[in-house]
Amino acid sequence: MTTATTSGDLQLENRVEALLDLATRAGADAADATVFGSDQISVGRRMGQVETLERADSAGVDLRVFLNGQIAQVSGSDLTDNGLARLAERAVGMAKYSPADAFAQLADPDQLAQNLPILETFDPVEPSTGAMLDRAAEAEEAMLGVEGITNSGGVSAGWTKSSLVIATTNGFLGSVQSTRHGLSVSGIAGEGEAQKRDYDYSLAVFGEDLKDPREIGLEAGRRSVRQLGAKPGATAQVPVIFEPRVAVRMFSLLMGAINGESLVRGTSLLADHIGKTVIAPELSVFEDPFLKRALGSRPFDGEGLPVQERTLFDQGVLTTHLHNLATAKQAGVNPTGHASRGGASIGIGYANAWLSPSEQSVDDMLKDAGEAFYVTSLMGQGANMITGDYSQGATGFWVRNGELAEPVESMTLGGKLQDMWLAMSTANDLTWFGGMGTATIRMTGLTIAGA
């Protein structure tokens, strides 16, 4: 058996191996399974008062069985021998009446990941509830001290320790432990119907890598206050500049367009674009699952295949779609190690993908634009991933003479994704949001509808 561990949980490994044995005994031709466990602490505070203080732990199991070309997927939370036996019998019973699936499969043994790196996804230091409450208090007090803030929307601090084990009947056993620390603050500025609310937050694998609580609170306060007096702006066609927090949503549209599931369903506008220029030639998109201390890192994908560093867009040119075993077989290509687990179902995911930054500062980007719309919030989904039609509500600031001017709201952006991607550029402020990173993005060719 290929064993691939990164500080795994031996008890969970024992449970997943027992489950696969039970599935085989129940009649399955093959099977794969995940067993997971988590321990969480969360605290909440508002206006100096503790509102929540919770600790919870959970465990669960997902099983997929193969029987004569038919598959069934089941989930459960009983990890006892009897509980696992019932789950295995239920899965095999369901598979007998399931339709055949010509594409679902396990990896060949020689495709499986091995010799895995240590990714530093686990922080051994568990924070005390007292330390988390102190952190929350410091952040809220800083936010309330910002001139113009009239109330607190609340502050929350959290910590999660997770263990995940994936195993297959054809020889893979992989486990990983991870941690996540978080702190978020929401501020309220103004009174009555003129109130404005915004937030700031920080997430990290290691508690010591969180942003300073005072910095988070001050930023939440400043972001709330600066929206006061916002009104709909005029209809115009000027450059649109997305701050990183919303730029990552634009980047996610691009990443969604190369998802293998969309490709095989016929819902990707980039289905036939490998080898073609899709984004501005000055830009590339990279993926590195092996970044140390990063929230998106992983040593193997959801089917036990190896992951690797990739250039997904090379100087504007699309180099690959993202595939798991099933979508790769359906598309007639090799899997790329991008399987993800959502319960017993297999999807597509990526690990630490980022849009290349430039050397231009945000200030210089604003100055070069002269007049522009600087977007700080987007509303709704607004993208047709088959046609590329894009329309989305937005708020932010008008840029005049290269500087942020009055706040604006109730604006609507419209354009064509294909044109927007080719006409975008980035600043030098690369910012990470979980497993995705992007800098400030500038796009041209959009219509901005306002008052």
Whereabouts are the PLM-identified features?
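Active-site bordering "gate/hinge" segments
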Residues: 1-298, 302-305, 314-317, 401-403, ...
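Dual-mode signal for accessory low-complexity, basic/Gly-rich regions
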Residues: 271-451
